[in-house]
Amino acid sequence: MKETIYKQLEKVREASRKLCTLSDSDINSLLNDLANRIPGNSQTILEANQKDLDRMDPNDPKYDRLLLSTSRLESIASDIRNVAELPTPVGRILEKRTLPNGLALKKTTVPLGVVGIIYESRPNVTFDVFALCLKSGNATVLKGGSDAMYSNMAIVDLIREVLVRNNVNPDTLYLLPSDREAAGIMLNAVGYIDVIIPRGSQQLIDFARKSSSVPVIETGAGIVHTYFDLSGDLQMGKEIVFNAKTRRPSVCNALDTLLIHRERLDDLASIAEPLAEKKVIIFADKDAYPALLSRYPSELLQKAEEKHFGTEFLSLKMSVKTVDSLEDALKHIARFSSMHSEAVIASDAVVKDEFLKRVDAAVVYANTSTAFTDGAQFGLGAEIGISTQKLHARGPMALQELTSYKWVIEGDGQTRA
């Protein structure tokens, strides 16, 4: 298998070197062609997706991530069109100056080269990643999970067909076999792949980080907190907590832990009331539990254990922790946060400013839902992932994060003494 994969990766590397010959207009035309062909191929894609769904327990938190539908495919097509409309990130001049010796120097953005994505469940990622990589001049190597095998194969077949129709080398995109051996080969394909971006569970991300000899950009798990301050508006709190927890509980920006100021415990039942409609299970600490007892459905209320803090639930479950102050909330977040998205609900400007300044996360919010941590919501088009690390990229990663830069120097015969 290793030899076969390396031969294909060499073709991908060669294809990546030719992408610089495509104009931005060529790329945009190809992306729009792909978006326009999704509806006509939706039946084939959805049938393949159903084969994957049939192999998964509907109660599995990953089921919703795996699920495609006509409306989701329409949304994907719209996202691809949005990417086509964005300005190219390649060729931007970051710095430009003339040195004392007359050399003209400029720093300009260039593609990373070959981008490898290892991911689980989400077949929409196949479309998103290809669109972003092509727009930024990169070739793409995909390693999807076995749970989305049929979906990914159908999507890649469509994309490669569109590449050929637009006179672009189909080796610009390569889908690896879905088994674990292929993942190991990919993670050590130095010289073939320039960067690996894992998307999925913390287990997958840890595996990629520890096993890879290719540079890795982590798109970390989301252990997401919202702190309801002493000065928080009750109605705002109800709406934000409900949205952050229930909009799409299986995604990484969904709320996991509500921190509530001790002096607002009397309002906890009101904040939690809408959650009962969605049958959200609450793990409440020793102070929050009595505040919810008899005011929240007993079958949905449990006493919290230490393990419930620092857990990414990815389902209709959440924990509640009582804190005595903003300082306590900050300490709890510092201990359990995955540095993804954190929010505060407060009217006190000092509290808001202190929270936004001191919380170490890729995205911090005041008086709004963490559900907005998303490349499309940020106006970036589709996203490649949400990075929780600090080097190269942080937060929603889109086109700009798929580029590096090089120095271009022009002279008229200068030599160095």
From Swiss-Prot:
<keyword id="KW-0641">Proline biosynthesis</keyword>
<dbReference type="GO" id="GO:0050661">
    <property type="term" value="F:NADP binding"/>
</dbReference>
<keyword id="KW-0028">Amino-acid biosynthesis</keyword>
<keyword id="KW-0963">Cytoplasm</keyword>
<protein>
    <recommendedName>
        <fullName>Gamma-glutamyl phosphate reductase</fullName>
        <ecNumber>1.2.1.41</ecNumber>
    </recommendedName>
</protein>
<dbReference type="InterPro" id="IPR016163">
    <property type="entry name" value="Ald_DH_C"/>
</dbReference>
<keyword id="KW-0560">Oxidoreductase</keyword>
<comment type="pathway">
    <text>Amino-acid biosynthesis; L-proline biosynthesis; L-glutamate 5-semialdehyde from L-glutamate: step 2/2.</text>
</comment>
<dbReference type="InterPro" id="IPR016162">
    <property type="entry name" value="Ald_DH_N"/>
</dbReference>
<dbReference type="GO" id="GO:0055129">
    <property type="term" value="P:L-proline biosynthetic process"/>
</dbReference>
<comment type="similarity">
    <text>Belongs to the gamma-glutamyl phosphate reductase family.</text>
</comment>
<comment type="function">
    <text>Catalyzes the NADPH-dependent reduction of L-glutamate 5-phosphate into L-glutamate 5-semialdehyde and phosphate. The product spontaneously undergoes cyclization to form 1-pyrroline-5-carboxylate.</text>
</comment>
<keyword id="KW-0521">NADP</keyword>
<dbReference type="InterPro" id="IPR020593">
    <property type="entry name" value="G-glutamylP_reductase_CS"/>
</dbReference>
<dbReference type="InterPro" id="IPR012134">
    <property type="entry name" value="Glu-5-SA_DH"/>
</dbReference>
<dbReference type="GO" id="GO:0004350">
    <property type="term" value="F:glutamate-5-semialdehyde dehydrogenase activity"/>
</dbReference>
<dbReference type="InterPro" id="IPR016161">
    <property type="entry name" value="Ald_DH/histidinol_DH"/>
</dbReference>
<dbReference type="GO" id="GO:0005737">
    <property type="term" value="C:cytoplasm"/>
</dbReference>
<dbReference type="InterPro" id="IPR000965">
    <property type="entry name" value="GPR_dom"/>
</dbReference>
